[in-house]
Regions:
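Bacterial N-terminal signal peptides that target proteins for export
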Residues: 2-14
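Hydrophobic core
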Residues: 14, 18-22
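Sec-dependent signal peptide cleavage junction
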Residues: 22-34
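Glycan-recognition and catalytic cores of secretory/periplasmic carbohydrate-active enzymes
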Residues: 32-292
Length: 292
């Protein structure tokens, strides 16, 4: 049965390709004038997504009518839930925050034209406040919530505590905060906060605090130069780190931009030999890091 379905599908696709091949080129030409995009609407919907993901006490500017306060007993409230889960994974969260910050830093005029500047700044500040709160000096919170336990229940996060108890799970363990000095996570958090300090300069009175935490988190990441604590935790089943020099490089660059201190540029340069290379080549590996 599966083979017959496969053959029918293949035949249909082949016939479709033959029909397209028989059409004159003029019939397949698409004019650039046929395409139009409302970038302001795309921006609004993107920011709305981040507001859907907000954890903890919701700010009064949150526009998602079906959301309410949640996970209010977390050791560190706020931040974003990951995907459709109820866990706060700081590695992808910090990367997303750094991209938001970079967008504002590089294209402020474009954001002004969309009419979404206030909403953008609000959402960026919301996640940066959380990342700053995760910095505890000699260690950092890199995850809140247990992914394995979280995946045993599907429902609205506002009812998570009841769902966990209904499953016979210990809610306190399900919302435990994981701490460490993982270079990848602390480095990414440092990059997000340093980029945020640059992007929000003149728009927020918190930039000095963001930069202070960025520098400390970078110190932890650089001194540790390991992801063992992170990769041996619940996080490894979801966002395992394969290396950390890319995050150190990324963070050092943003700290140089934010402070102008040569030492950060020197650090960034020193990491380059440790960045991944293409197989059988001396060329830097094309990976997520190429976005910068």
């Amino acid at each position: 049965m599966q083979m017959r379905k496969h053959l029918r599908l293949t035949a249909a696709l082949t016939a479709g390709c033959l029909v397209l091949g028989a059409l004159p080129c003029s019939a397949l030409t698409v004019s650039a004038a046929d395409f139009s995009a409302n970038y302001a609407e795309a921006m609004q919907k993107s920011l709305y997504f981040y507001e859907c993901q907000q954890a903890g006490p919701l700010p009064d500017w949150n526009e998602v009518e079906w959301r309410a306060d949640s996970t209010m007993t977390d050791e560190v409230t706020g931040g974003w839930y990951d995907a459709g889960d109820h866990v706060k994974f700081n590695l992808p969260m910090a990367y997303s925050a750094s991209m938001l910050a970079w967008g504002l830093y590089q294209y402020p005029d474009g954001l002004e034209k969309t009419g979404e500047m206030e909403t953008y700044v609000n959402n960026l500040s919301f996640v940066l406040d959380y990342l700053a709160a995760c910095d505890e000096g000699d260690t950092a919170v890199y995850q809140v919530g247990n992914g394995q336990m979280d995946h045993t229940w599907w429902g609205p996060v506002e009812l998570l505590e009841y769902g966990m108890k209904d499953n016979g799970a210990d809610y306190t363990k399900a919302r435990a905060a994981l701490r460490g000095t993982s270079s990848a996570v602390c480095g990414e958090m440092a990059a997000a906060l340093a980029a945020g300090a640059c992007a929000l300069k003149g728009r927020s009175d918190k930039t000095g605090d963001y930069l202070k935490h960025a520098e400390n988190l970078f110190r932890l990441a650089d001194e540790t130069r390991s992801d063992d604590d992170y990769n041996n935790s619940d996080a490894s089943g979801f966002y395992r780190s394969s290396h950390f020099y890319d995050e150190l490089f990324y963070a050092a660059n943003w700290l140089y931009i934010a402070t102008g201190e040569q030492s950060y540029l020197d650090k960034a340069t020193s990491y380059i030999p440790n960045l991944g290379k293409e197989l059988g080549s001396d060329e830097l590996k094309y990976s997520w890091g190429m976005c910068w």
